């Protein structure tokens, strides 16, 4: 769990920026989105395969350059 303590004399905006960075580093947002609804095993597999195809196309495009 991301936790940021407000340091003495520190503006709230700086603490908020540190909190957002910590949340991104811990992939909390991605985890919440993943658990927001149930995916059937077949759907999970299709999503995973689609991501793999996308990744492979991107890699092939990079190698052509």
UniProtKB/Swiss-Prot annotation:
UniProt xrefs under Pfam families = Ribosomal_S21
Q: Which InterPro entries match?
A: Ribosomal_bS21 (IPR001911), Ribosomal_bS21_sf (IPR038380)
Name the GO terms of the biological process aspect: translation
Tell me if Transmembrane is a UniProt keyword of this record: no
Q: What molecular functions are annotated in GO for this chain?
A: structural constituent of ribosome
The yes or no answer to whether the keyword Coiled coil is present is no
Q: Which GO terms describe its cellular component?
A: ribonucleoprotein complex; ribosome
Its keywords, alphabetically, are: Ribonucleoprotein, Ribosomal protein
Q: Which domain of life is it from?
A: Bacteria
Q: Tell me its family.
A: Belongs to the bacterial ribosomal protein bS21 family.
UniProt name for this protein: Small ribosomal subunit protein bS21
* Organism of this sequence: Acidobacterium capsulatum (strain ATCC 51196 / DSM 11244 / BCRC 80197 / JCM 7670 / NBRC 15755 / NCIMB 13165 / 161)
């Amino acid at each position: 769990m991301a936790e940021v303590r407000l340091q003495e004399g520190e503006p709230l905006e700086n603490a908020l920026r540190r909190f957002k960075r910590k949340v991104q580093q811990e992939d909390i947002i991605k985890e919440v989105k993943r658990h927001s609804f149930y995916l059937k095993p077949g759907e999970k597999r299709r999503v995973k395969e689609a991501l793999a195809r996308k990744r492979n196309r991107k890699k092939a495009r990079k190698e052509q350059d």
